[in-house]
């Protein structure tokens, strides 16, 4: 049985390699995750990530669903990022983000009126 440890970009990794039927199986532990090179992946709850992610309430979920139904998938992504506690600017180009804000926040009241009139016609 071979065992070793190494450090890469601030994370400590443990590596255990076993020879079984001439097929090496390597286990890697990434702090709270364990991944086997044989293709089997075992997930453990990552305490760090669960502390950073906010819970989304029902009203916020409704807004996301309404934007998806309206075909505004990019805006749904912005809402999902926002409500989860992430900054959308970190994931979306600045110009795109500003355009989405203008179309959905500033012009949102005008567009809602248009959608209501369209729903009546349909």
From Swiss-Prot:
<comment type="subunit">
    <text>In bacterial two-hybrid assays interacts robustly with itself, Asl1930, Alr2902 and HetR and weakly with HetP.</text>
</comment>
<dbReference type="GO" id="GO:0043158">
    <property type="term" value="P:heterocyst development"/>
</dbReference>
<comment type="function">
    <text>Delays heterocyst differentiation and commitment when nitrogen is limiting. Interplay between the 4 HetP paralogs controls the timing of commitment to heterocyst formation and its duration. Epistatic analysis show that the 3 paralogs act upstream of hetP to delay commitment (asl1930, alr3234) or inhibit development (alr2902). Asl1930 and Alr3234 must also attenuate the activity of Alr2902. Ectopic expression does not complement a hetP deletion.</text>
</comment>
<keyword id="KW-0364">Heterocyst</keyword>
<comment type="similarity">
    <text>Belongs to the HetP family.</text>
</comment>
<dbReference type="InterPro" id="IPR049598">
    <property type="entry name" value="HetP-like"/>
</dbReference>
<protein>
    <recommendedName>
        <fullName>HetP-like commitment protein Alr3234</fullName>
    </recommendedName>
</protein>
């Amino acid at each position: 049985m071979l065992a070793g440890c190494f450090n890469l970009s601030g994370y400590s990794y443990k590596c255990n390699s076993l020879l079984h039927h001439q097929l090496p199986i390597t286990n890697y532990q990434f702090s709270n995750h364990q991944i086997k090179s044989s293709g089997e992946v075992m997930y453990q709850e990552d305490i760090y990530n669960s502390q950073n992610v906010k819970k989304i309430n029902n009203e916020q979920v409704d807004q996301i669903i309404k934007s998806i139904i309206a075909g505004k998938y990019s805006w749904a992504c912005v809402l999902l990022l926002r409500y989860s506690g992430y900054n959308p600017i970190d994931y979306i180009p600045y110009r795109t983000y500003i355009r989405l804000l203008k179309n959905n926040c500033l012009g949102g009241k005008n567009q809602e009126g248009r959608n209501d009139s369209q729903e009546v016609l349909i």
